[in-house]
Amino acid sequence: AQGFERLNPNGYFKFNAADSIMTRAPENATTAPIPEGFAPLVAGGPYIQHNGPLDVLHQGNVVKFGFRVEPRHTSPMGNLHGGMMATFCDMLVPLSVHRKSDQVSNRFLPTISLQIDYLAPAPLGAWVEGEAEPLRITRSLVFAQGLVTADGVPCARVSGVFKIGPVAPRDAVE
């Protein structure tokens, strides 16, 4: 494969960026403005503050979360790293449920199970945006699903099961 060189006979490869066929985003790709209506998300704690920033749009019953793919979010191929997508999805789904359900709006929702189907890459500079909906809320569990797009193109489908935990600190759910 162009852009890779074999490291050893066991089949491990080393990425060689100088020979890569990947396209590079324009220099201003990660400084493009966030879409109108989005504002910085305050919730999430130190982990999200370090790995974000994430933005939220909340208008009526529409709740969307998003972020711009920065170089620090990318894999060696120049696309959003799957781990960052998983982090985003793990914030998207429970926080969407908080905003769409009075039953659990102030409760911590630790993840029991998170299923992500990666549909397409999200390149450097892309605006990644997601929406999620609660499917069912029981006495102790929340079932929810969502869709994530990159510049409007579906890039991940997510579903999750979350435990209804104790009342959460205010900055964890807002």
Each language-model region and where it sits:
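Terminal targeting signals and extreme-terminal segments of soluble enzymes
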Residues: 3, 13-174
